[in-house]
Amino acid sequence: MATKPQDANTTSREAITSKADSPPRPTALIFDSGVGGLSVYQEIRQLLPDLHYIYAFDNVAFPYGEKSGEFIVERVLEIVTAVQQRHPLAIVVIACNTASTVSLPALRERFAFPVVGVVPAIKPAVRLTRNGVVGLLATRATVHASYTLDLIARFATDCKIELLGSSELVEVAETKLHGGVVPLEVLKKILHPWLSMREPPDTIVLGCTHFPLLTEELAQVLPEGTRMVDSGAAIARRTAWLISSQENVISSQDENIAYCMALDEDTDALLPVLQSYGFPKLQKLPI
């Protein structure tokens, strides 16, 4: 088996909870096209458990992996603006590799608060590989992004980088979080280009925030000893540093909240999952 990673008016669905008294704390927005960003949120919450967290996901335009860069930039700006109009944001984390590779410059130009993005953990993977073959598992948009190719050119000149783009795997991760079973045969089919290699990658970069949610299943399919790395812990450390560096941050006593772009049967089913992550309320975000 492979080893696991190392390092306004709104309609709402609410849990019946009582507000516990809590000290004021800065507000952090975690955004993803789907629920994969919860893997990044987990890492951040471990370091910063007392922040006021908002999780927003774009279940109308999901998945972003097949969308144009122009569409993604406009969409992310629209959503972050809508949240910012309702909450005093101290920091925004774009917990989506695809969105990060295209939208960060526009976000940083528009907003005064820091914006953190997620990029493939190619540099640490290069340090870990033993056979000199590193696999990048991401959406097709991330695999072909100029930012990704630049990372490879800067940090992986002495390694062979095998690229594998899959939007299907994103759907599989979403299915798992909704309570579905992950068929290993589906994973084997997706990973076949690597599994059929004479010398497959011994280190895999999980280049989509959805994929750490599947590490248990991926470990059953990948060759024994394969390492998987993602950038979640590094993003958490960066977020903690940026929060600690701010002065006169507006704090909130509100409870954590999740926003989606449309309420439907799928979001109804997702509410218990969000509650387990510490988000008692799920509301539609008017944009």
From Swiss-Prot:
Q: Which residues cross the membrane?
A: none
SUPFAM superfamilies hit by this protein: Aspartate/glutamate racemase
Molecular function, one GO term: glutamate racemase activity
Q: Which UniProt keywords apply?
A: Cell shape, Cell wall biogenesis/degradation, Isomerase, Peptidoglycan synthesis
- Database matches in InterPro entries: Asp/Glu/hydantoin_racemase, Asp/Glu_race, Asp/Glu_racemase_AS_1, Asp/Glu_racemase_AS_2, Glu_race
Q: What class of enzyme is it?
A: isomerase
The catalysed reaction is: L-glutamate = D-glutamate
According to UniProt, this protein's pathway is: Cell wall biogenesis; peptidoglycan biosynthesis
Q: Which residues of this UniProt protein bind substrate?
A: 32-33, 64-65, 97-98, 209-210
E.C. no: 5.1.1.3
Question: Which HAMAP family does this one have?
Answer: Glu_racemase
Q: Which family does it belong to?
A: Belongs to the aspartate/glutamate racemases family.
User: What's the protein here called?
Assistant: Glutamate racemase
Give the organism, scientific name: Yersinia pestis
